[in-house]
From Swiss-Prot:
Gene from which this protein is expressed: norM
Parts forming coiled coils: none
Family: Belongs to the multi antimicrobial extrusion (MATE) (TC 2.A.66.1) family.
Protein name as annotated: Probable multidrug resistance protein NorM
Membrane-related topology note: Multi-pass membrane protein
GO biological-process terms attached to the record: monoatomic ion transport
This protein's UniProt keywords: Antiport, Cell membrane, Ion transport, Membrane, Transmembrane, Transmembrane helix, Transport
Presence of the UniProt keyword Disulfide bond in the record: no
GO cellular component: plasma membrane
Xref: CDD domains: MATE_NorM_like (cd13131)
Subcellular location: Cell membrane
UniProt GO molecular function: antiporter activity; xenobiotic transmembrane transporter activity
Function of the protein: Multidrug efflux pump.
Pfam families to which the protein is assigned, alphabetical: MatE
Amino acid sequence: MYKTKCLREKLVLFLKIFFPILIYQFANYSASFVDTAMTGQYNTMDLAGVSMATSIWNPFFTFLTGIVSALVPIIGHHLGRGKKEEVASDFYQFIYLALGLSVVLLGMVLFLAPTILNHIGLEAAVAAVAVRYLWFLSIGIIPLLLFSVIRSLLDSLGLTKLSMYLMLLLLPLNSGFNYLLIYGAFGVPELGGAGAGLGTSLAYWVLLGISVLVLFKQEKLKALHLEKRILLNMDKIKEGVRLGLPIGGTVFAEVAVFSVVGLIMAKFSSLIIASHQSAMNFSSLMYAFPMSISSAMAIVVSYEVGAKRFDDAKTYIGLGRWTALIFAAFTLTFLYIFRGNVASLYGNDPKFIDLTARFLTYSLFFQLADTFAAPLQGILRGYKDTVIPFYLGLLGYWGVAIPVATLFDSLTDFGAYSYWIGLIISLIVSGALYRWRLTVIMKRFESLAKSKR
């Protein structure tokens, strides 16, 4: 990160940060995409099982990764104030925090997940696949969270290209392990859909090992003195939790409502479950665009706010939102034209392809709403405003999505589509609430700047 003097310099810096994050996010979401697509080609029953498992896994995992992502604005503010010597200490506190959170998530997966999956009316074969998938996936909890901390460090330092290169390793690793374990290639036991969970875990363990080597060999990081042993500092842990808990809670509120809808789909047929999850999976892949804008905004805004250059932060906000709209125009057009082709990536049954394509049509409205809402979340994190956005997200997602969806399901014959309509409306409401909050925060900082002149 560095100070910019004009709009052109800001645009160049923003794009330098954004594009590596975008590629990184695509690689990140590709793990779920590969699991779903390869399992779908194996058979629909296993796909339904993996779908149910990810509906339970995603909310809790994203909650914890949201907590450790608080490292980005913390380091951003240090750099903006010229306190680079504080970076290593905060990094190690978040490593300790990630290890503790890993134990929590592991316990939840091992003890709660089987109980939930066996009591929501799933077919026995589907529930069995889901439980085994989660058990295998839990092997990778520690490297998943530790890598999230390393990535947050690299991103906050503006080294997004380095984290991109690391994450690009995930796709071939995950695909290779999945091929071996799902289909039983080269004498490896055939595990079916559950093998996708083990494949992802093994891929992340390898990725973590490579990342640690890079961390201590990278010339640009040697000035941080990461090789020095830093003991646990509970004050910094508390600060990280104080800032990260609302971030994780906001992400959890959004992802959990999608997952609850996925679990509600258990009352429909295996075909509907598989089609719903396939469309939702591709929507998540497309979410990489607004999510990348959000992450880039958190980096640049936190840096400028830390340096008390509030007008510069405002300029970046405008650049980020326009970038989001431009990319949305391309992605929405692409998905509308090729929705049938996209559906065929997940299976070859004509009924499955037709139903998935219909769900993908609804996902166009998801992406439009996310284009507006997701960047706002990153901007607010850049201002270190996380508590109120958490409550706004809770209201927008849970106060709207399920009630509206249930109402549509009861009063119309839309069936499974009712729940997509509820989700779309909740995203629109949440975006409006975040926009209101940003207006309040920006006015507050503008008043603060004027009072100090």
